Amino acid sequence: MKAEYKFREKITDDIVDAHETIRVTAKALTEGKIDKASALDNLARALKKLESAKYYIERG
């Protein structure tokens, strides 16, 4: 049974955005194409997206 959320699209968008940010940041770090400060900034943004998704899930 799928959960019924009023904010399904927002939740999905936030999770997909966070996943993509983390994936791209990890790849750039592995390839040495990003500095630590930028990587941390990107990961902080991804965390905010996940926190947003959590908020909307709890609002349900």
For the regions a protein language model found, what residue spans apply to each?
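Short, charge-rich amphipathic interface segments used for partner binding and complex assembly
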Residues: 9-60
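Short intrinsically disordered terminal tails
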Residues: 1-4, 58-60
